[in-house]
Amino acid sequence: PKPFLLHGVTASGKTEVYMRVIEAVLARGESAIVLVPEISLTPQMTRSFCQRFGRNVAVLHSKLSSGERFDEWRRAERGDAKIVVGARSAVFAPVRNLGFIVVDEEHENSYKQEESPRYHARDVACERARISNAVCVLGSATPSVESYHRALRGEYNLLELPHRVEMWEMPTVEVVDMREELAEGNRSMFSRALSQAISDSLDRGEQVILFLNRRGYSTFVLCRECGYSMRCPECDVALTYHAAGSSIRCHYCDHEEPVPLVCPSCGSRYIRYFGAGTQKIEGEVKRVFPRARTVRMDTDTTRRKGAHETIVGKFKKGEYDILVGTQMVAKGLDFPNVTLVGVISADTCLNLPDYKAGERTFQLLTQVAGRAGRGEKGGHVVVQTYSPEHYAIELGETYDYKGFFDEEISCRNEGMYPPFSRLILVVVSGKNLRVVEKYSTALVRTLQAKVRSVKEWKSIRILGPAPCALARVRGMHRWQILLKVDPCITPHDHNKLIEEMLEACPPPSYDIIIQVDIDPESML
C-alpha cells in the first residue's frame, strides 16, 4: 500500500489514531514501529503506549546504555515486544511480522542521519513498509513540503484532522514588531505584550513556555574598543558565552576557554556580550519575575541521562511555572496547564543561509504554538519578530499551512529546489585552504565535462565551488559543490556520476576528505 500522510493540527489526536491502528495490527498477530524525532519525546510516547499496551512495548534510542539497548533489541527480535518506540535508528528494529510503521512529526530534520551511513528514517520507513507489505503513516501538523507535494501528486494517501480533540480552539497568536518596541523605547528582550501576558498567566496559576532556538547566554563576545570578536581557533564561528562556569564555548567542536578580562587584540577592558541565548532568557525571567519558578531545557541542561524526563515530569506536575527552552520544547510535549507560549525571536531560523529557512520557521512557530491551550483553558501565543511581513510569520499567525505551502512551493519551483530537483551536496575539506580550493575547482571542471557527455545528465545544474556557510570546522577548511538534479534521474545514475567524477579526479592526498550527501536536510 501507498504511505499515508496524516496532516493533523496540533492536539488533534494523531497519537490516538496510531494507537487504534496498532490495536488492529496486534489483533492480526503483527508488530509495529513508532518513530519520534527527539529522544526527549521518547519517554512521553513510551508512557502513553505502555499505559495502553503494557509490556508489549520496547524502547530504542541512543541515550540507552549498550546493555539496555541490547536487552530491548532482543525483546523485539524474540517477539516479546510487538511495539518498538524510538528515535530514527529504531526504524531498523528486528520486529517479527511487521504490519505498521509510524513516523511521527515526519517533517523533522533530526530523522536524517548526518554521519555515514547517511539515511533518512522517513525514506527507510516507507521502503521497509513496502518490502514488508506493511502500512506506513507519516504524521505531522506541518508536513514537509516534499511530503505534502507527494500527497497532492497521489504518491501518498492524504488524511486530514483539521480540528483539535473535543473541538478545543487553536491558541490565539499575537505578532509583535520588535522594531516598533525599540522605537518606543523598550530595549528589553521582552515586548510589553509578552511581559503583560506572562504576568497575567502567573496570576492565574497557569504555566508559560518561552522559546528561543539558541542556547548559551550570549551569541558572541565583542571588544567595544576595536571591534575584535572572540572566535573559535578551530572553526569559523563566534564563541558563545555561557554564564555557568564563565566560559566561551564553540558549539561545533566544543572548544572552551575562560572569558578574557581584556581584549586579546588591543588590551581594552571594554568586553561586552551581544545577542541572547536560553541562559540569558532564563536569567532575565528570574530578574523580571522573581517569584516565578523557572527551569531551562536545552542541550546544556539535558546532558545527563534521564535529565529530559526529570525536567518534563517536574514541569508537568506544576513544580515550575516557566519553562525556557530551545526546539526541544517545540515538539510533541503535552502540558495541559500551559496557556501561554512566547517566541522570543522568530527570526533566528529565518536568517539562515538555507533554502528551507522559511519552512523551518513556519514549522517551529506552529509546533511551539501547539504547546499552548492543550486543555479546556485555551491558549495564547506571542511571537516577537523583526520581520512580521515575511510570509512564514504572516501565515504562521493564522496556522494557514496550505497558504504557506502555496507560497513556498512557488519559491522552490522558481529556484529549482526540492521537490522540483534532488540535491547532491559535495563537501571537500582539508587542513590546507589552497589545496581544498584547487581540488574543488578541479572537481567542478570534471563534473561539467561529465554532464556534457551524457544526454540524460545535461539538465543537471552545478553550483560552486564556494566556501561552505561554516567555512572552517575543527581546523578543517570546507568548500562545497551543489548539484541540482532532475527528479527523473535515478539514484543509480546519481551514484554513477559521483563514482565517475572521483575516478577522473581523485583527491590529491589523504589529507582531503570528500563527503557526498544526497538530499541534504541542511545547507549548513
Where are these regions (language model features)?
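Nucleotide-binding motor/catalytic cores of P-loop/tubulin-like NTPases across gene-expression machines
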Residues: V454-K455, R474-H477, I489
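Inter-lobe coupling/hinge segments of SF2-like helicase ATPases
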Residues: K2-E437, T441, A469-A471, Q480-I481, ...
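Short helix-terminating capping/connector loops at secondary-structure junctions
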Residues: R204, E376-K377, K455-S459, P508-D511
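Hydrophobic, Leu/Ile/Phe/Ala-enriched alpha-helical segments that form helix-helix packing faces
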Residues: V285, V368-A372, L447-V451, M501-P506
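Short helix-capping segments at alpha-helix termini
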Residues: F53, F289, K450-E456, P506-S509
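Short amphipathic alpha-helices in soluble, non-transmembrane regions
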Residues: Y439-R445, D493-L502
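A carboxyl-terminal module marker
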Residues: R445, A449, K455-V473, I498-E499, ...
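A subset of signal/propeptide-processing and intrinsically disordered low-complexity segments
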Residues: T490, N495, I512-I514
